[in-house]
């Protein structure tokens, strides 16, 4: 068995990735979220597959097909609730995973980081097209508002929007193609995950100190397999509690009403995991400016490795940068709250200030703090 594990072409890859992989001995629970994201992806693909067997991507029957899944299909309600809340768990793990990368300087593995940013964008695109499929009020109007943002692109904007819609409004063609995208994108995500892991295993994992861990490595199995199993059980407990006891907690009540192009909901807003970006979009009273700020809010992650001016990798021994990091976290929570509020005072000004602070912390304050901490650590003899 040992020989097969180490010699068989496929088993050898699995062995080098999950069994005999040398891992730093001191990685904390913040390193669990990568494996949790893998589990989330598998859960989403499996539940999504079973939903796709019963769903119809037609404007006349989409809403009732979802109702049919919840009422008539064996455990359809559970599969649907797991899929909807699984998306929330996915994004929760994603945000923590990215936050961990920023805190401990994992972004200095540039290839891994850049593939990670592409993965984040792909997952966001998948979640957006998936939200349109139940064809409720918020599905329809969310699709209308967000796709309409592309009309801000000079010259080709309106043509591009109509091309994506497949007509002059969000209709049957739009729903059908969004279902096709929602089906194919998770498999593209799986391929990107493979590339992400390939680049990660070229360098090995980072660790909380940010120092070179080569002097003290342990095998991934059994140490981290058992640790990941514990993380999975905790996440599964939270997911199942959410899906069983309050499945509609994170959803929008408007989505219980079938899509109606003649009736606009009073407050159009996306799912909670997009609210921070939505708040940044709304904080600029100009269409093109808002779209650019929305893109920048995610794409700013790509330039983070270039903004690393400190001699230390991790924030573990950098108290000023730590304060800024947690200020950024609080700021993102504020933006999430603002994104769900109506466009009126005082929410407008709070959103604008939080948006400015978001970019200021990442682009200006954190690099400055890194330089300042280096300066404080320099020995100064009289």
Swiss-Prot record:
UniProt GO cellular component terms: mitochondrial inner membrane; respiratory chain complex III
SUPFAM superfamilies referenced in this protein's UniProt entry, alphabetically: a domain/subunit of cytochrome bc1 complex (Ubiquinol-cytochrome c reductase), Transmembrane di-heme cytochromes
Chief location bin: mitochondrion
Keyword vocabulary terms for this entry: Electron transport, Heme, Iron, Membrane, Metal-binding, Mitochondrion, Mitochondrion inner membrane, Respiratory chain, Transmembrane, Transmembrane helix, Transport, Ubiquinone
Subcellular location per the Swiss-Prot or TrEMBL entry: Mitochondrion inner membrane
Residue sites binding heme b b562 per the record: 83, 182
Sequence positions that bind heme b b566: 97, 196
Cofactor, free-text remark: Binds 2 heme b groups non-covalently.
Gene Ontology process terms (BP): mitochondrial electron transport, ubiquinol to cytochrome c
Obligatory cofactor(s): heme b
InterPro entries membership: Cyt_b/b6_C, Cyt_b/b6_C_sf, Cyt_b/b6_N, Cytb/b6-like_sf, Cytochrome_b, Cytochrome_b_C_euk/bac, Cytochrome_b_N_euk/bac, Di-haem_cyt_TM
Gene3D superfamilies, A to Z: Cytochrome Bc1 Complex, Chain C
Assembly and oligomerization: The cytochrome bc1 complex contains 11 subunits: 3 respiratory subunits (MT-CYB, CYC1 and UQCRFS1), 2 core proteins (UQCRC1 and UQCRC2) and 6 low-molecular weight proteins (UQCRH/QCR6, UQCRB/QCR7, UQCRQ/QCR8, UQCR10/QCR9, UQCR11/QCR10 and a cleavage product of UQCRFS1). This cytochrome bc1 complex then forms a dimer.
Similarity remark: Belongs to the cytochrome b family.
Miscellaneous field: Heme 1 (or BL or b562) is low-potential and absorbs at about 562 nm, and heme 2 (or BH or b566) is high-potential and absorbs at about 566 nm.
Protein name, UniProt field: Cytochrome b
